[in-house]
Amino acid sequence: MYLISKLYSLDKNINNKKNYSLSKNVIWASPKGFDLAMDIYSPTKEGSSFPVLIMFHGGGFLLRRKYIIENMAQYIASNYDYVVCNVDYRLLRDQKNSVTFDELIGDAFGAVLWIKENIFNYKGNEGSIAVTGDSAGAYISAMIVNSGNKIATSGSFSDHLCITPSYVPESITAEDVKNQNLLDVQAAVLSYGAYNLYSSALKGIFETRKNPFWTLALSKPRGVFGNNFNAQENSEMYKAVSPIYNIPNIDERKLPPQFITSASEDRVTPVHAIEEYVKALKDAGQEVTYWEYKDQRHAYLDSGKTFLSGNDFKRDAIPALKKIMNFLNSKLL
């Protein structure tokens, strides 16, 4: 996968370096001493303010880093006039397998706040931002969209069920973020995500060896909030970080327009589960466009080629990215 990804990076149809400047591994926060970085692609085209696309990678919250969607970032930066931010967040296995699920989501919230404060330095328009991600990254993006108004800057998640961002601008409080809608974005694209951690944990899947990502990550399965909490006795905690339980009715709060995709042959996040989430959004009156990518498997947006699944970025991802960017152009330009 890695070698093919690098080869695709030499293809100017995927990666035309004349069309962007790259700020690589920009450190934007260091929660508990763990450096978090993002790659920022800025258009070389004349202009001072371009829409911003924030990207979060997949990997079951246990695997991968931003490199896995590097071809995607390169393709968008090469072919569209967007500032692209490819963001890393802590995985559950990081910091000696101690990261909690709310901390992971807090990294994503912090990234949005950092980008809004600083993206003007990279030719980005902080008032025209979209979030996107695939698989786990779609889940994270959905949490930003649904729960960006549920934050705290102190106290324990188990007490207040609010997310603490890993980065908050100086002199800004949780109330400021909420009252000024600082985590609001203007559009979202969610690709083959899962949106119900509570259900998976309740069934004894996510936090056990039944979840193969623990084994692949060479990590011991555990509770995602630590060993003192579980889905049976602490359902409110698990529901608080499950997007499907946090969709507001449009009369309460209008969400940004969303483009949600599935893959017809996906066995990791099957079509029926994604359609359930789309239905929940529609039932709440929220704006959503849904597309099922026929004859495709999970992770078709990954860089390079995935030999086990047969995915090929050049063949499979680019048609999907054209649809995604058509949607974003219709909402942000």
Regions found by a protein language model. Give the residues of each.
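Alpha/beta-hydrolase superfamily serine-hydrolase fold, recognizing
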Residues: M1-L333
